[in-house]
């Protein structure tokens, strides 16, 4: 797994590597400048430092800090090292050493990042060098604590496509065949008065009035009532999402909620029961009763079957990822790799999430039963399960644009707390709300793409760039906790969408082996034998680990596709030229244009 150490270590994100190859993303390409800059990006300061590289030792360099990134360029002739770190990636900045520190390179800054790497810089003790760099980094990495805007609100990039137009909720519901005689679209939440963390348009049973919805909302955590996420195109079974019922220790009941779930059940005439998947371990669901929550009991919900999926909470997932980071950065212990990976429990959690989503998809497709999914508040594990199940069931979501719509719909519009889970611009790195829930979802998607290499239009780079900009604060896509907050901040007017960047250069993110198959259901194998650590993401910063290179067959196939496209373009140009000649009035019976055959392409 390990390869020989190299003296040239480039710690770039995938996106920053693309900056050097293309100007489509709007980066300043002036090679006389020391640091690449986006429109709206300004240089704040620069300073000579010693970068304590965990792989090659101390390297003298100059660090540049802008209002968007930390950029380090090596000053040593035998090193081509460049570090390019968006400030949004930084989780914590700590001072290293004190005034009495005498060890070599023992005085400086330690920087912890959200993307599985740490940085250490040694600075001179005189001239307040460390203090100045610490204060500037803290100010721009954590702008919310200093009444400064996130960089997304300063970014002036322009693209030839508008990513904000990718998702239109009503159009997406119409694609699914909604509304119909069982389901209607309501705008009761237009002003976010019913539920401030739900989107404005909701799909609910046709027989449920808006007054019914208001009464049901009083019995669901955060007023997150059961609403439709997806409907099967043939058997018309549905996936419905919500939060936990407010049962409490006394076992409270709510006739309106019970009746509402019955109405949902009755939209499906094939099965007499509604299947409820509670994402939590049963012991946690019982414990939630102490804080007013709970689950649907058999006594209250006679026509429902309840299953617990044993997926752990945000705190367990956060600690698990910390353990992954400990074993992959900076060094990988080859001799204890398997036991170390097992001790993180990360792949066990991936397995449980995938297993739960498979159960949801199978129950809807093969079991012909409508399904209701919830966890506690319905914005973490619930989003994982519904979106993964929809990805398995609906081939549309496996296209580039379809996946963007899936993320916009099930995660962004339905209130996954991105600001709280990621901590955009927030210095409180110990916040208990931080958790890698969305990363876990993307990891599950990657696991599926490994098992079904022709089923997804997008490639691995597509997934990695989404994760890179989950943290970067360059785009407005993942900012804030819910749709109502984004509307208040006018995010779609004042920021650029990540989908603008991706969709303006789609070829870069396409899987050359993609085969479009409509209505094919994917059932990944969620066993530990078939799951693996995503090396190209989690261990990409370590130059000693041999990254998984593109398959030579894949590379050749992409070259042939490019060649085919070039030939098609040239043939089309010939056809246009030929058509123009044929439309000209003949100059003589033996005009060459009359004798030229019409060129056709058989591609």
Swiss-Prot record:
Which residues does the record give as a 1,2-diacyl-sn-glycero-3-phospho-(1D-myo-inositol-3-phosphate) binding sites?
A: 288, 313-314, 376-381, 421
Which biological process, per GO, is one annotated for this protein? intermediate filament organization
Its primary localisation, in coarse terms, equals cytoplasm
Q: How does it sit in the membrane?
A: Peripheral membrane protein
Q: Could you say which EC number(s) this protein's record lists? A: 3.1.3.95
* Binding annotation for a 1,2-diacyl-sn-glycero-3-phospho-(1D-myo-inositol-3,5-bisphosphate): 288, 313-314, 376-381, 417, 421
Q: Where is the composition biased (Polar residues)?
A: 1-13
Q: Name the chemical reaction catalysed here.
A: a 1,2-diacyl-sn-glycero-3-phospho-(1D-myo-inositol-3-phosphate) + H2O = a 1,2-diacyl-sn-glycero-3-phospho-(1D-myo-inositol) + phosphate; a 1,2-diacyl-sn-glycero-3-phospho-(1D-myo-inositol-3,5-bisphosphate) + H2O = a 1,2-diacyl-sn-glycero-3-phospho-(1D-myo-inositol-5-phosphate) + phosphate; 1,2-dioctanoyl-sn-glycero-3-phospho-(1-D-myo-inositol-3-phosphate) + H2O = 1,2-dioctanoyl-sn-glycero-3-phospho-(1D-myo-inositol) + phosphate; 1,2-dioctanoyl-sn-glycero-3-phospho-(1D-myo-inositol-3,5-bisphosphate) + H2O = 1,2-dioctanoyl-sn-glycero-3-phospho-(1D-myo-inositol-5-phosphate) + phosphate
Biased composition annotated in UniProt, kind: Basic and acidic residues: 14-25
A GO molecular function term, named singly, is: intermediate filament binding
Per the record, what about its domains?
The GRAM domain mediates binding to PI(3,5)P2 and, with lower affinity, to other phosphoinositides.
Q: Which domain of life is it from?
A: Eukaryota
The enzyme class is hydrolase
Quaternary state and partners of this protein? Answer: Heterodimer with MTMR12. Interacts with KMT2A/MLL1 (via SET domain). Interacts with DES in skeletal muscle but not in cardiac muscle. Interacts with SPEG.
Sequence positions bearing Phosphothreonine: 495
Q: What is this protein called?
A: Myotubularin
Entry function: Lipid phosphatase which dephosphorylates phosphatidylinositol 3-monophosphate (PI3P) and phosphatidylinositol 3,5-bisphosphate (PI(3,5)P2). Has also been shown to dephosphorylate phosphotyrosine- and phosphoserine-containing peptides. Negatively regulates EGFR degradation through regulation of EGFR trafficking from the late endosome to the lysosome. Plays a role in vacuolar formation and morphology. Regulates desmin intermediate filament assembly and architecture. Plays a role in mitochondrial morphology and positioning. Required for skeletal muscle maintenance but not for myogenesis.
Q: Which residues form a coiled coil?
A: none
Q: Which residues form the active site?
A: 375 (phosphocysteine intermediate)
Q: Where is this region: Disordered?
A: 1-25, 579-603
Show where the GRAM domain sits. 29-97
Q: Which gene encodes it?
A: MTM1
């Amino acid at each position: 797994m390990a390869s020989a150490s190299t003296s040239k270590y480039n710690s770039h994100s995938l996106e920053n590597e693309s900056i050097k190859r293309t100007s489509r993303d709007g980066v300043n390409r002036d090679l006389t400048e020391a640091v690449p800059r986006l429109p709206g990006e300004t240089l704040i300061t620069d300073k000579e430092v010693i970068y304590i590289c965990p792989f090659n030792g101390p390297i003298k360099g100059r660090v540049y800090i802008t209002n968007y990134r930390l950029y380090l360029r090596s000053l040593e002739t035998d090193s081509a090292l460049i570090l390019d770190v968006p400030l949004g990636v930084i989780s914590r900045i700590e001072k290293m050493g004190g005034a009495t520190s005498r060890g070599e390179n023992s005085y400086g800054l330690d920087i912890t990042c959200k993307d599985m790497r740490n940085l250490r810089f040694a600075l001179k003790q005189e001239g307040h060098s460390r203090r100045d760099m610490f204060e500037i980094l803290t100010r721009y990495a954590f702008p919310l604590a200093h009444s400064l805007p996130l960089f997304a609100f300063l970014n002036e990039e322009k693209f030839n496509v508008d990513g904000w137009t990718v998702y239109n909720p009503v159009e997406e519901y119409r694609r699914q065949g909604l509304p119909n005689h069982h389901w209607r679209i309501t705008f009761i939440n237009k002003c976010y008065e019913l539920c401030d963390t739900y989107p404005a348009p909701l799909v609910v049973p046709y027989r449920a009035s808006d007054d019914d919805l208001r009464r049901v909302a009083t019995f669901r955590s955060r007023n997150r009532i059961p609403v439709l996420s997806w409907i099967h195109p043939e058997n018309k079974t549905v996936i419905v999402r919500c939060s936990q019922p407010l049962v409490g220790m006394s076992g409270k009941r709510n006739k309106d909620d019970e009746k509402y779930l019955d109405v949902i059940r009755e939209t499906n005439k094939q099965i007499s029961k509604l299947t409820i998947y509670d994402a939590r371990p049963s012991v946690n669901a019982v414990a939630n009763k102490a804080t007013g929550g709970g689950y649907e009991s058999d006594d209250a919900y006679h026509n429902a079957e309840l299953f617990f999926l044993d997926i752990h909470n945000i705190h367990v997932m956060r600690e698990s990822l910390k353990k992954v980071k400990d074993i992959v950065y900076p060094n990988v212990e080859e001799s204890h790799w398997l036991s170390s990976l097992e001790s993180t429990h990360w792949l066990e959690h991936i397995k449980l999430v995938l297993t739960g989503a498979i159960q949801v998809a199978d129950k809807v497709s093969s079991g012909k039963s409508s399904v209701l999914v919830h966890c506690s508040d319905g914005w973490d594990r619930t989003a994982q399960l519904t979106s993964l199940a929809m990805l398995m069931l609906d081939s549309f979501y496996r296209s580039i644009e379809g996946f963007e719509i899936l993320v916009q719909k099930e995660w962004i519009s339905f209130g996954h707390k991105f600001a709280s889970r990621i901590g955009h611009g927030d210095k409180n790195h110990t916040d208990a709300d931080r958790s890698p829930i969305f990363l876990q979802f993307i990891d599950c998607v990657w696991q599926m793409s490994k098992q079904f290499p022709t089923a997804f239009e997008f490639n691995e780079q597509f997934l990695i760039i989404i994760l890179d900009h989950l943290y970067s604060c360059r785009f407005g896509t993942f900012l804030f906790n819910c749709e109502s907050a984004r509307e208040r901040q006018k995010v779609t007017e004042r920021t650029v969408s990540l989908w603008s960047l991706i969709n303006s250069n789609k070829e870069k993110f396409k899987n050359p082996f993609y085969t479009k198959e409509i209505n094919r259901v994917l059932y990944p194998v969620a066993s530990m034998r078939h799951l693996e650590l995503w090396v190209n993401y989690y261990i990409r910063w370590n130059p000693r680990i041999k990254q998984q290179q593109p398959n030579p067959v894949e590379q050749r196939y992409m070259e042939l596709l490019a060649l085919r496209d070039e030939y098609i373009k040239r043939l089309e140009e010939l056809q246009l030229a030929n058509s123009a000649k044929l439309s000209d009035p003949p100059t003589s019976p033996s005009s060459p244009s009359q004798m030229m055959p019409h060129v056709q392409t058989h591609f």
